[in-house]
Regions:
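Blade/loop signatures of beta-propeller domains
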Residues: 42-76
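Blade-loop segments of beta-propeller domains
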Residues: 82, 91, 109-199, 449
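Beta-rich, blade/repeat-based domains predominating
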Residues: 86-97, 148-151, 171-201, 251-282, ...
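Conserved beta-propeller blade signature
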Residues: 101-103, 201-203, 282-286, 357-360, ...
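Residue-level signature of beta-propeller blades and closely related beta-rich strand-turn architectures
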Residues: 108-110, 208-209, 289, 364, ...
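A short loop-to-beta-strand structural motif that recurs across blades of beta-propeller domains
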Residues: 150-154, 230-233, 293-295, 367-369, ...
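Loop/turn-rich, solvent-exposed surfaces of beta-rich toroidal or solenoidal domains
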Residues: 357-371, 394-443
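Blade-level signature of beta-propeller repeat domains, shared across WD40, Kelch, NHL, RCC1
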Residues: 456-504
Length: 504
């Protein structure tokens, strides 16, 4: 049953949504008490109840007629403030592990010089000029008292407590002692993609390119990563390096490579994201910004298992560097060419459902393609994009009228059937709730803005076992939010056949 307005508040209080109640209670009651003595009538009216109601009103449900979906409200107390004067940059990756811990993988080098003003001189650039650990000029040393970049990998519990932090330029000594080129470990130039598998191994990658300036080479540790990001790294949960797939420093794609990496592993290029199947221990890789394929490897050894492109085709046709297989989605859309035979950069996610279907975010083509996981990866031709061939099941356009970049990330609801598909639309700043059976939009939440419950480029979405949704943002937003689920546990009924149609 769906409730709205003051009914939402009543539902919350009846259901005792503890996380929000705790976040809003003590502070607002103390504030109200203090206000009665300082003469501020506005604060006199700020009570636990109406503070909660104000939060609820920020994310009203927008259900489709005939459809049912979970509703969400942002948790203003998640995560808790970071220690050590730390600050995070853009969120390149985010995942929830099997223990309901939330892992955030951020980009310290996305922080501006003033954001990371507490960093002093850490080395010299090629011109002998003093710079900070993330490459900003420091001719006079430290700029200010706030702040310093947190380590790139942050682990939180559901209450928002920070449990672990390691890796990257925000972790002094890590790049010199724990992720060393001599061991085959090159920390990414630009953090992108994290997953924690059923054995608690942490997988990360990156999409930095020296040729395009996203690896500037200015950092004191720049020799650690060489050329463009072209590795997938596997760590233990404490940050101990285990395995590398691919070799670092590639400068062009090869979407049909099977063994060009170190130790006989295949060669990825500018990887976006990945997931591991706990039943088969296959690592499914969205490969990605440079290559245009889904790559399959053994998660224990990194050895090649299979790969495929759009519509399940193997070999993959065309490369992102070939003008005949590129260009702008918007131009093709205007010409009515809405079924490209290739993934268009970036191929941004690969997520596996419990019932054996692989959902792939073809962000460059504003669509999600669906495959039967057991039927892909082998040589197969499907130039017409026929369902039932090469493991291809179907595809779902996501706001196809948008210039580019809608299908950025997706996750499944926590009900046993995983009946909802949550798709984060980067460009329209929205998360769609989609009935996975009908592929119709039954609700949406978010919307553009910088405030609580709003998004600017929701880059990654993930879900915990209670159905709460976590979203990380990029493009200067440098934000991660938790949305508490209430109401329905899953999606059902009919909705909008056109997912992402512009609506007020």
């Amino acid at each position: 049953m769906r409730v709205h307005g003051s009914g939402v508040l009543a539902y919350f209080l009846a259901a005792t949504v503890v996380a929000i109640s705790v976040a809003c209670s003590t502070a607002s009651e103390q504030t109200a008490a203090a206000a009665s003595t300082n003469g501020n009538p506005g604060l006199d009216t700020l009570t636990k109840a109406n503070a909660l109601e104000r939060v609820v009103e920020r994310t009203p449900p927008k259900p489709a007629s005939g459809g049912t979906a979970p509703s969400f409200v942002p948790d203003p107390g998640w995560p808790k403030p970071l220690p050590n004067n730390w600050i995070i940059g853009d969120v390149g990756g985010l995942t929830v592990d099997s223990h309901d811990n939330i892992w955030v993988y951020h980009r310290p080098r996305a922080l501006s010089s003033t954001d990371a003003g507490a960093l002093g001189e850490a080395g010299k650039n090629a011109k002998g000029q003093p710079i900070s650990a993330i490459g900003h000029p420091r001719p006079y040393g430290q700029l200010s008292g706030c702040c310093v970049p947190a380590p790139s990998v942050l682990k939180f519990d559901k209450a928002g407590n920070l449990l672990q932090a390691w890796g990257g330029p925000g972790d002094p000594g890590f790049l010199e002692k724990r992720c060393r080129p001599g061991d085959g470990c090159y920390w990414p130039g630009r953090e992108h993609g994290i997953f924690v598998d059923h054995n608690d191994f942490v997988w990360i990658s990156g999409n930095g390119e020296i040729s395009r300036g996203t690896n500037s080479g200015e950092y004191p540790w720049a020799a650690n990563f060489g050329g463009d990001d072209s590795q997938i790294l596997k760590f233990k949960a404490d940050g101990t390096f285990v395995l590398a797939i691919g070799k670092q420093g590639m400068t062009k794609p090869n979407s049909n490579d099977t063994n060009g990496g170190i130790n006989g592993t295949p060669q990825p290029y500018l990887v976006a994201d990945f997931t591991v199947d706990p039943k088969t221990n296959i690592l499914w890789i969205a490969d990605g910004y440079g290559n245009r394929r889904v790559l399959m490897v053994d998660a224990a050894t990194g050895k090649y298992i299979g790969h495929f492109g759009a519509y399940g085709q193997n070999p993959v046709i065309g490369e992102s560097t070939d003008p005949a297989y590129g260009g702008a989605w918007a131009a093709d859309f205007r010409k009515g060419e809405t079924k490209p035979k290739y993934f268009r950069s970036p191929l941004h996610c690969a997520e596996l459902s419990k019932d054996g279907f692989l959902y792939v975010c073809d962000r460059g083509n504003n669509r999600v393609q669906v495959f039967k996981a057991s039927d892909v990866g082998k040589p197969c031709q499907n130039p017409a994009g026929e369902a039932g061939k090469c493991g291809f099941v179907g595809e779902l356009p996501i706001a196809p009228q948008t210039a580019s970049g809608t299908s950025g990330s997706l996750a499944f609801s926590a009900d046993p059937e995983q009946s909802c598909l949550y798709v984060a639309d980067l460009t329209n700043f929205t998360i769609y709730s989609i009935n996975r059976k009908t592929l119709q939009e039954v609700d949406r939440f978010g919307g553009g803005g910088r405030g609580l419950g709003q998004f600017h480029w929701p880059h990654k979405v993930s879900v915990d076992s209670e159905g709460n949704v976590y979203a990380g943002e990029v493009d200067g937003s440098a934000n991660v939010q938790k949305f508490l689920r209430y109401g329905a546990a899953g999606c059902s009924g009919t909705g909008h056949a056109e997912v992402g149609k512009y609506r007020q």
